[in-house]
Amino acid sequence: MNAVTKITPHADYKIADISLADWGRKELDIAEHEMPGLMSIRRKHAQTTPLKDVRITGSLHMTIQTAVLIETLKDIGANVRWASCNIFSTQDHAAAAIAATGTPVFAWKGETLEEYWDCTLDALTFTLPDGTLTGPELVVDDGGDVTLLIHKGYELENGSTWVDEPASSHEESVIKALLKRVAVERPGYWARVVKDWKGVSEETTTGVHRLYQIAEAGKLLIPAINVNDSVTKSKFDNLYGCRESLADGLKRAMDVMLAGKVAVVCGYGDVGKGSAASLRAYGARVVVTEIDPICALQASMEGFEVNTIESTLGRADIYVTTTGNKDIITVEHLQAMKDQAIVCNIGHFDNEIQVDALKALKDVQKINIKPQVDKYVFPNGNAIFLLADGRLVNLGCATGHPSFVMSNSFANQTLAQIDLWEKRDTYEKKVYILPKHLDEEVARLHLEKIGVKLTTLTKDQADYLGVDVAGPYKPDHYRY
């Protein structure tokens, strides 16, 4: 482990370097000015502290922007423990700034998978005054890892044999080993965690997909709020965030000229739309791949070529996966690519690209160029560059989305946490979406910062539309 661990009555953290705290604090101050939604919520609720003494575990990229979210949750009363949701996404100066305030944080850039899952367990382990180990009352999740760990741990205590089944990946084997260890070291721990757990708010598409799968199987243990599908998250973070941060990641990793290159974007959902726009803005010739005829038609109407991955092999210079699905780029695709092709992912997990299969190929030489940039040379002499080991390129090779767009997402997260706690006795064990009036509130909080002035409906106009003058203005089924 290359992290610094400190556990005392006044500090509890595992980070890279606490001396980076001053730098982190300076960037936090800058970010706060770019995050009007979070800061407004902080001011509004600082006196009433709606999350007073609520134990919250966060599993979300430990960036400067996330640090502003953490301090917002703390300022409205929460007792917070945090880990990153990706082995490469932590900004070490952000983690140091949070650790320096006394908030337990367990994250550093470049964790191993074993370290990552240990950090996740650390983040969800709270100690009661009598010394009993317990868990969070609320969870902020990104990708569903905390939710997965608690559910699998609880199932193990109730007779599940999943941990003894063959693992489908190295990461799954790490999770199973951790659960076996906890079963020995902390008997009955997951039952105590579930007893107090009141809800989770989920940040990203992949995590939401996991939640719906668990709910459909009748195994969801708590109410969950799908933050990802709030309009002010999916249509802003996923779209406009990727539009800026994808090119940033590619440029920092490879210093590559994008103009004139053939770039393949796999998937044309919100993330794919932002990614395709990012590459086209720099002059790349973009090819989109899609399974969905509606998304394919959208891409075509925007002027993109829509074709298969196979049709691009040997001619494309850059590949970006955005789908949230697995095996999008296979090892056979990688071997058939143009020499020196750049391959990366901006979907949540690394299984969009068959990285494990690539590493298992015989006679393939791996050359590390710099952190998160690896060159794989095939026996025929051709090579590809794999960025961030197939994980999120914008966070692994750059610093992720800009602060302003993350203020939208994190304002939603904060409101979701408040909503889950205030309605903890009425919410059922199913997946919810934040109501439209809160979605509109989040948008409204960001308008002044960019000089937007809204038109106001007259009473007659509002009556004609069948809405309130103050909103909400659209029905839930409206597609923005």
From Swiss-Prot:
UniProtKB keywords:
Cytoplasm, Hydrolase, NAD, One-carbon metabolism
**Binding annotation for NAD(+):** 204-206, 238, 267-272, 290, 325, 346-348, 394
The main location class comes to cytoplasm
Give the signal peptide range: none
Q: Which Pfam families match?
A: AdoHcyase (PF05221), AdoHcyase_NAD (PF00670)
Coiled-coil annotated spans: none
Q: Where in the cell is it found?
A: Cytoplasm
Pathway the protein acts in: Amino-acid biosynthesis; L-homocysteine biosynthesis; L-homocysteine from S-adenosyl-L-homocysteine: step 1/1
Its BP terms in the Gene Ontology are: L-homocysteine biosynthetic process; one-carbon metabolic process; S-adenosylmethionine cycle
Q: What class of enzyme is it?
A: hydrolase
What is this enzyme's catalytic activity, as reactions?
A: S-adenosyl-L-homocysteine + H2O = L-homocysteine + adenosine
The SS bond pairs are: none
Return the cofactor note field.
Binds 1 NAD(+) per subunit.
InterPro entries hit by this protein: Adenosylhomocyst_ase-like_sf, Adenosylhomocysteinase-like, Ado_hCys_hydrolase_NAD-bd, NAD(P)-bd_dom_sf, S-Ado-L-homoCys_hydrolase_CS
Q: Which residues cross the membrane?
A: none
Q: Does the keyword ATP-binding belong to this entry?
A: no
Question: Which residues are substrate-binding?
Answer: T63, D142, E203, K233, D237
Question: What does the sequence similarity comment in the record state about its family?
Answer: Belongs to the adenosylhomocysteinase family.
Q: What does this protein do?
A: May play a key role in the regulation of the intracellular concentration of adenosylhomocysteine.
Supply the name of the protein.
Adenosylhomocysteinase
